[in-house]
Design a protein with these regions (language model features):
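N-terminal leader/capping segments at the start of a protein or of a new domain
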Residues: 1-68
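Structural signal for conserved beta-strand scaffold positions within catalytic alpha/beta enzyme cores
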Residues: 6, 36, 72-75, 152
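Conserved short histidine dyad/triad with adjacent acidic residue
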Residues: 73-97
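Short, conserved beta-strand element in jelly-roll/cupin
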Residues: 95-115
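A short secondary-structure junction signal
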Residues: 113-116, 121-123, 142-143, 162-164
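Conserved metal-binding segment of the jelly-roll/cupin
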Residues: 124-144
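Double-stranded beta-helix
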Residues: 143-179
């Protein structure tokens, strides 16, 4: 279930909700787009082209709205040989010169935003669209045994390009450990 937890920078939990409308509204206040899309009931073995075809209307709408030029599908399973390296790549606080847009087709992952003196944990699940605005500091944790498929959208054809902040704040907050 999608969850939003808000913390002070010292780690004190300030609030938590699983209500989709509340999550959308609260995140909009800091410039983050969060939406719930209907899922398509794709087979567990559906791959990139089939996934993109199933969500073509939504993807085209987002491309037109955001100017995205590069669209792909990423799938990471618990037995992926590079899962630990992939996880580490995203765990440090960073920014991007463009929005970071992800739609979770399957599974889940934890986006953590660092904005306006707060830390915002957003557990994204199947059917969640998350758009972190350009320049917002954040990190992403897929967990030690990741199991998700997501559609990614980029303006830059080179894809994911991060500028790491050098802050250790991500190390001071719990990692994503699914139940």
């Amino acid at each position: 279930m999608s969850t939003l937890e808000i913390f002070a920078e010292d780690g004190t939990k300030l609030s938590e909700t699983t209500d989709g409308g509340t999550i959308t509204g609260v995140l909009a206040e800091i410039g983050v787009n969060f939406e719930r899309w209907p899922t398509r009931g794709l087979s567990a073995d559906a791959k990139g082209d089939a996934i993109l075809a199933a969500y073509a209307p939504e993807v085209e709408w987002l491309k037109a709205r955001g100017g995205y030029q590069s669209i792909d599908v990423v799938s990471v399973a618990p037995d992926h040989p590079d899962r630990a390296t992939m996880r580490t790549k995203f765990l440090s606080e960073h920014t991007h010169a463009e929005d970071e847009v992800r739609f979770f087709v399957r599974g889940e992952g934890l986006f953590t935003l660092h904005a306006v003196g707060r830390v915002w944990n957003v557990l994204c699940c199947e059917g969640d669209l998350m758009s972190v605005p350009a320049g917002m500091t954040h990190w992403f944790d897929m967990g030690a045994a990741p199991n998700f498929t997501a559609i990614r959208m980029f303006v830059n054809p080179d894809g994911w390009v991060a500028a790491f902040t050098g802050s250790d704040i991500a190390e001071r907050f719990p990692r994503y450990e699914p139940a």
